Amino acid sequence: FVSRGLGDVYKRQFLNKGIKITFTDSSQKKEKISEFKFDGGVIEFVDFLDAKREKLINKNGNDVFKKPIFIESKKDNVELECSLKWNKGYTEDIYPYTNNIHQKDGGTHLLGFRSALTRVINKYANENNLLKKNKLVISGDDIKEGLTCVISLKIPDPKFSSQTKDKLVSSEVRMIVETLINEKLSIWFDQNPSVAKIILAKIIQAAMARDVARKARENVRRKGSLELSGLPGKLADCQIGKQEGTELFIVEGDSAGGSAKQGSCLLYTSD
């Protein structure tokens, strides 16, 4: 109970910067006192979560983030604090809170954040011609890779999906969070171009890997459909997927087929 309680107190205390909490454990013969006070708030929380992960570095080998991105704003009685950064990894670690309560199933505040983040990233990439060469579309999954984020919301009368408060369902929150994140994060990207380009390079790399994986899946499916269609098992497919510019050689016997393969371009020719 004590360790679980301490962990909960420890994380929540990040959301209340400057306030000290004293935890006294009298269950043992020797009384144990633990004190928690974090002046850095959600910024310090993100650094705590990211402490053991491989940092995203610049060309000089230095940590890209001297400190995490921090957003603080208010609209229509909704107070928002958000901090985020990227590391070199592939997994996302995101903690949405409402009135100091963690929503493990997310909710409207998380949906608003994701929507704004995807919009800001794509807008910045397009405005700086970072996608033109690769002809890619960045998705939310690409942005998630290596993202660590804490969202803390303070709102009157929040609505949850159940008594456990694991998911926020207040409908008005999504647009408010989306508007605030979009506005503040756009400014941050414009003011920090060197860091922004390193972030985008990581995200674009994830998008390229996703695109390569998609094409590989399509190729496997296409070849599988050819086999299922009853075509001869000895048909050697060409390497490109488009019909234009390709040709089909039909020969009699394996020996002739071997000569045909040696004398043709496998990129455009099926034998």
Language-model segments: residues:
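Single conserved hydrophobic/aromatic residue that forms the stacking wall/gate
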Residues: 1-10, 265-271
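GHKL/Histidine-kinase-like ATPase module
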Residues: 11, 16-19, 23-166, 227-262
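Extended, well-ordered alpha-helical scaffold/bundle regions in very large, multi-domain proteins
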Residues: 140-199
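Metal-dependent catalytic core segments for phosphate chemistry
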Residues: 171-176, 180-195, 244-270
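Long, highly charged low-complexity segments enriched in Glu/Asp and Lys/Arg with interspersed Ser/Thr
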Residues: 195-204, 209-213
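Cofactor-binding active-site loop characterized by glycine-rich and histidine/acidic residues
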Residues: 215, 228, 267-270
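N-terminal cationic and glycine-rich segments that engage phosphates or anionic surfaces
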Residues: 218-223
